[in-house]
Each structure stands twice: as C-alpha cells, then as structure tokens.
Amino acid sequence: MKKLIILCLLMPLCSVMQATVSDSDSIALMRIYKEATIGEIVVKGSRPLVKVENGMLHYNLNALSEKKNVSNVFEAIASLPGIMEKDGALSLNGASSVSVILDGRPTTMTQEQLNTLLKSMSVDRVVNVEVMYSAPPRYHVRGAAINIVTKRAGVYSFQGELKAVYQNQYFSSCEGGANFRVSTPKMAFDLMYDADDVKTMQHYTMDSHHTYQNKVYDISQSAWGRYKGWNHSLRAAYEYNISDKSLFSMAYTTLLSPSDNSVNDVTGNYQTSRLDKYMRSYLHNVSVAFQLAFGLKMSADYTNYHSVNSQLLQSDVNEEDNQLQINGGQDVRKISLSADQTHSLRHDWTLDYGISYVNAYDKDNQYYTDVKGSMPTADTDTRLTEQSTDFYVSCDKTYKSGPSFSLSASGEYYTIGNYHKWAFYPQASVTYFKTPKHVFILSLSSDKTYPSYWQMQSSVTHLDGYQEIRGSSHLRPCSTYSLNATYAFNRKYTFSLFYEDAEDYFTQSMYQSSERLALIFQTRNWNYSRQYGLVINAPFSIGTWFNTQLMAMGLHQHEKCADYFDIPFDRNKWLYQLSAKNTFSVSPHFNIQLDGMYTSPLIQGTYDLTHLLDVDASVKWRFCKDKCALTVRLQDIFNSGLPKTKVNYANQKFDMNTTYYQRSLSITFSYRFGGYKGKEHKEIDTSRFGH
C-alpha cells in the first residue's frame, strides 16, 4: 500500500518530463476549461485564475478550489502553490514566517486566533487571495503576507451553508457550523458560527543521558496526554456601501473555550507523575473600518482576551513525593488604530502614506499553593504595557510593460516596560513585465518579531517531575531582513531565490541542566538564524482528469548562538523539500486528491531532526446539483509527518519521539442553499496571547 501511494505521488514527476506546452498555456498561470456545445461545434474557453501585479500573486480562490477537496478558507489557502499547512499553521516556501490578514486591515487577534476564524469560513465568501513576499506598508504587516479579500455587497442575494464533521485521531469527535449571508446593492450582513468538540491523544517517549556532577544519569520516560474541550467561534459582520468608492464595515468575533481539561501521565525509571489541568478562556474582537472616495482608509480594532487555569501536579521523583497546586491566568486588552491615504497621480504614479498605533495591556499571574517536596517554585504576578507607533510613506509607479516598482520607508517607536526603541524598515518591490511569458519580481523587506507576553515572564512551570518551562524576562525582539527574486515563466512555472537574515532570533529549545537533574524548556535569543535557497513551483495537467502542483526547494541553514547556556553553537546544514499536490477528476462531481511532502533531515539549534514524509488523501463527492458535498480526508497516512528529535552536542545527549497518533480521519458533509442574485452592482475597489 505504501509503495503504491508513493508511486502515485511520483507519477507526475515522471510524466512532466514528457509533457509539451501549448501556446494557450501561456494565457494564465493556472486555468480551468469550460466547454460550450453549439450544434456539433465545441468551443473551449479559459479564464485566468492567477495574475502577477505590483509584486503580488493574485489567486482566484473560488476557481482554484472547484476541484480541490477543501471545506473552508484555511484549507483552500493551504492548497495554493508554495503554501503549506502543518500543525494548524500556514507557511510560505522561501519565508521563515508569513502573516495572514483579512481585507488588508490589521487585527489585534493572534495568527492562531485568526486561523481558527478562517477554518469556520466558507470558501465562497472570498473574492481572491494576495500572496506577497514583501507586503506594502499600507497592510501594516511586514515581510511575507497572505491577504484574504472577502466579498463586498453588490447584488441581491441570500446564501448559506450548513456543515457537520466527524473526526477521529485516536478519539472520535465532532464539529458543526453554519454561515449565512444577506446582501443588497447597498449593504451586506454575514453571520458565522462553529462549534468544535476537540479530543486529542498525545504520546511521546524520551531517553535522556543527563550529565550532572561528572556523572551520566540514564533517564527514560514515556508520557500519555489526553485533552478534551469545546471551542466555539462566532462572527457577525456588516458593511454598507456609502457610494461606489466609499464603504463602512464592522465586525464582531468571539472565540470561547468554556471548559478545557487535560491529563498527562508520565512513567519512567527516574520519576512518575500525573498532571491534571483545567482551563477556560474567551476572546472578544470588534473591528470598524471606513473607506472614503478620495483615498482615505481608517480602521480601529479592539481585542479583549481572558483565561484562567488550574493545575495539580503529583510526582514521585527518585522516591521523593512532590505535589504542586498551580493557579494562573492572563488578561489582555489590545487596541489598534490606523489611517492610510492614497493619491493617484499623473502618469500612473501612486503615493501612499499612513500611521498606526497599537496599545496593549497584559496582566499575568501564576501562584503555587499546597507545595510538598523539594521542587523549585516561583510565583508570578506582572503587568506589562506595550505601545507601538508606526508611520510610513510609499511611492509606486506602474507601466503597462517593462518595470513597475514600489518603494517605501517605515518608522516605528516601540515601548514595553522600560524598553524604548526606534526602528527603521525599508521595503522595495520591482516587477518587470515584458511579455506574458516572462515576469520578474524582486522584493526587499524588513520586519521585527516580538515574543509573546507569557514568554517574557520570569516564571517556572513544571510539566512533570523532570521537565519544566522557564520564562525569559530579558528576551529581545527579532529583526529579520529578507530578499526574494522570483521569475515566472509562461505564467505557469515560478523560480524563486531567497535570502533571509534573522538577527536576535528566538525560539524555545530543550537543555539538560548542569545544576540539577531537570530538562529545561526555555525561549532564548540567538545571534542569528540565516537561510538561503531556491524554490521551484511547476503545475502540470493531463487532459481534464489529472492536475498536479509540484514543488522542489533546496535550503541552507546557518544558526549561531554564543550565549546558549554553557554550550555555544555555530551550525549549518543543507536540506531539501519535495511536494506534490495531485487531483484526479473521476467525474465532474467526484474528485480524488493525493498530496505528499518529503523533507530531508534538518537542524534547529543543537537539535538534529530526522526526515519526515507527510502523505494525505481525500475524496469529495458533490451531488444534489452541487448543493451537497461529502468529503472524506485521511491525513498523515503513514504517521510520519513529524520528525524525531535527537541531540548529541557537547554534554547534551537525548532522544525524543513525538510522532505517535498523528494520523487522522475526517468526514465532512456540507449543504449550501440560496444563491438568488439580482442585477449586478458596480464592485467596490478592494485593492500574541495564551499560557
């Protein structure tokens, strides 16, 4: 079975060697064909689904998803060329991180919270998706970004969708949702609700050869973690077309987790333990935006997040009984304001300038009560106020053929506690378009990434009798500089060279303590993390029954930290990644999808991570005049989509295997109704929390 599936994944690699490209293929990067029969004459037409404009890749998400087995906006974006999804997060090949934004406006929700919203959003709510390696400053994000442009009011219509999902990943669970949209030429109202019954099982094994006081202790343990809880998401949005070029919109989003429970049992030759944890949280977000005819856009976004948790840890460490009762919580209030002005000048020049302000207040606490034994504890009760003021100016020049460019400069004044910092961010994008067959894009961007509020606390959280998480109050933000060059051939194949330098890069890693027998998880700053490489994307099809999106990437990693506990490191490694997203159209209403990705061994600090192979399969059947759809999806078929972690560096030596129970099955049924449309109306121009 495994050999058969791998053979199917490799088939397009062999077939593309013999493929020829017709002249009509140059019309669009990816295309769909429609046949209209007039008597005995068959007329074939095509419409472009992707175009390159101002350094961006514009995707028609609805058209691309017609033959993809996707059930929501998040899954549809993950199916785009060069975009991957892993562990609930999106990534863009050639970029270490990517921001996801909605309708080009900043939000105070975290990326994880925004992803939760996208998973409850129907694909037909989206007009197109913009993918860029250097986001223009008017989006108020830096570096690589994915902008999701949603539908505007313009016709009389009433549409809706109901869905039900069965999931199994060791445990069985369910999910249900509904969304409705009512629109007229002047206004539109959207309502979405999703309820997800989450049940997961996690299992890992670890062998730690811990050097302490010139003696090596062999510590082995196995852990089983069970989690269950309900997640609710609700979004209501309203927009009003003041005029053809003026728009008012507002939206309310709430994410609720009223009762999450988890249990983690650990057995081993050094310690046994049990950790019971209870948590509840809620998030409320309100956003308001104005777009006026003379080019002014204003927006305001407010988020209120609250969580409380209670933990009871009972452990037997080296024949010593320990017990810790831990109570904690977090409150975050965050507001974002922005104003942007656009001037369309003579000779296709455009001038943009704007300002944004973000203010966040974070309250964190964690208290130890009912302490028994000798395990170290540290209470935490902190307040943080974070402020950021950004301003920018941007100049664009567009030509019908030849070079088009965008140049901008942004300034930022950032404060948190007693830390104050001015920063300057240059950005440039040049697009050279001579013929439809040859398009060049060169982009330069800079960015700064800040650690989460909880990571910056001087806290200690025990996972069991051997492992603990430590906060880092002196964490510095990471400054990233990126350069990307992309060549699009025949509007079909893309070749991208990239370089990225992340100074003061930070990530969480494990360290065997030299002071006592403890495995420490801590987020620390490194000197830098640098990478450069090449990404190739190549779509290919055979008739109308098969199409694939092939991707190959070669990447060089270089990571250095001169102040990593007592073992500085300076390491580098080459790696490669191959992927194929294959769709077999058995009939107009039945599709089979088989996706695979292979990544060679890689490094992360002192870690050596093994290779991984992630293979997914799905089938989708549309019936009842395409109003109903049934999708069956099997993810990580071979349970090999996560790497194993090995460390054998200086006095650090341990192995950890977390690859168990990654395979999952889901069955999704959806029903769409409505769809009546009146006469067309001119379309509006739509050019960090938690413990």
Give short role names for the model-derived ranges.
Residues 21-63, 87, 95-97:
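Short, acidic, small-residue-rich periplasmic hinge/interaction motif at the N-terminus
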Residues 28-31, 40, 73-76, 114-116, ...:
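N-terminal periplasmic accessory domains that precede
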Residues 74-109:
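Extracytoplasmic beta-strand/coil segments of soluble accessory domains associated
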Residues 107-133:
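Short acidic/polar hinge/loop motifs at secondary-structure boundaries
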Residues 139-146, 154-204, 229-232:
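Outer-membrane beta-barrel translocator/receptor signature
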Residues 623-691:
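C-terminal beta-signal and adjacent terminal beta-strands/loops
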